[in-house]
Every structure is written in C-alpha cells, then in structure tokens.
Design a protein with these regions (language model features):
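Short, solvent-exposed beta-strand edge segments and adjacent coil->beta transition regions
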Residues: 59-63
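Residue-level signature for short turns and capping positions that connect secondary-structure elements
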Residues: 39, 49, 115-117
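Vicinal oxygen chelate
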Residues: 4-8, 64-109, 114-120, 128, ...
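Short glycine/proline-enriched turns and hinge-like loops at secondary-structure junctions
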Residues: 27, 56-58
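Short beta-strand/turn micro-motifs at beta-sheet edges
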Residues: 49-55
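Short, solvent-exposed coil/turn elements at secondary-structure transition points
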Residues: 28, 50, 95-97
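Core segments of cupin and vicinal oxygen chelate
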Residues: 3-47
Length: 135
C-alpha cells in the first residue's frame, strides 16, 4: 500500500496509464486495490490533497517495482507509452534487470523492469549495480 493524495488521480495513473487491473475500489476508505494475478498485489490509500511530501531522507518506501515481461522490446514499448502520456522516464541497466523509472502524480517512484539474466544466482553482488540504459 502506498499513500497518495487523490484516489481518482492515482487510479488514472496506475490503471489508466500503467494498465494495472483494479481488483476492488473502496471509496469510503479512500483505497483502491490492483491485481497482478492475485486478488490484490498493490493498493493505494488516499490521504488528502493537503498531505505533505515525504522527506527523501526519511525512512520509508524508496519505490515500487513491477515486472512487465522478459524482453527489452517490452521495456521499450512501456517507455514509449509513458513518454507519449507526458511522463518523464529514466532507463537503467542493473545487470540482473533492465528498468525504467517514473513518478506517479504524487511523486512516488515506480520502476518497471524486465529480467536480464540469471546472473544474480551466480553473482549475488551484481544486484546492486546501476548504469544508464539506452532504449
């Protein structure tokens, strides 16, 4: 569950742009649950338009990540889709995965990724690497 300011605006991003199917909507609790195959894998909780931004150095969630496939072409298509919607995207090569990052309407960072290989099974330290990725 991540906190957002506005339920409808967040739904428009996560369902409308990222295409996460809605599993349940609870307007009375300002919550929406999204499915990735299970009943609910991800949820938003609206805390109000006046809620302050989380401080970047405070403890808490750094970002959420969603695996979108296995192929680099799937990541390229996701990048094109986000950019066509006016969303700024950063691409990164993590050796074990290839990723793009963007922010939701409330500044929460979202990672979309494809697995690059099984290198992490042989080199666990490879998981912490980051380099620019040209898509």
């Amino acid at each position: 569950v991540i906190k957002v300011r506005n339920q409808e605006r967040a739904e428009a991003f996560y369902n409308g742009i990222l295409k996460l199917p809605i599993a349940a909507r609870l307007p009375s609790k300002s919550m929406t649950f999204f499915t990735l195959g299970n009943h609910h894998d991800f949820a938003i909780l609206a805390v109000g338009d006046d809620a302050p931004d989380a401080h970047p150095d405070s403890p808490g969630l750094l970002h959420v990540a969603f695996k979108i496939g296995h192929l680099l072409d799937e990541l390229r298509e996701a990048k094109r889709h986000l950019e066509a919607a006016g969303i700024e995207v950063i691409a990164r090569d993590h050796v074990v995965s290839k990723s793009i990052y963007c922010n939701d309407p409330d500044g929460n960072t979202v990672e979309l990724y494809v697995d690059a290989s099984d290198v992490w099974k042989l080199q666990p330290e490879a998981v912490a690497q980051t380099a620019p990725l040209d898509l």
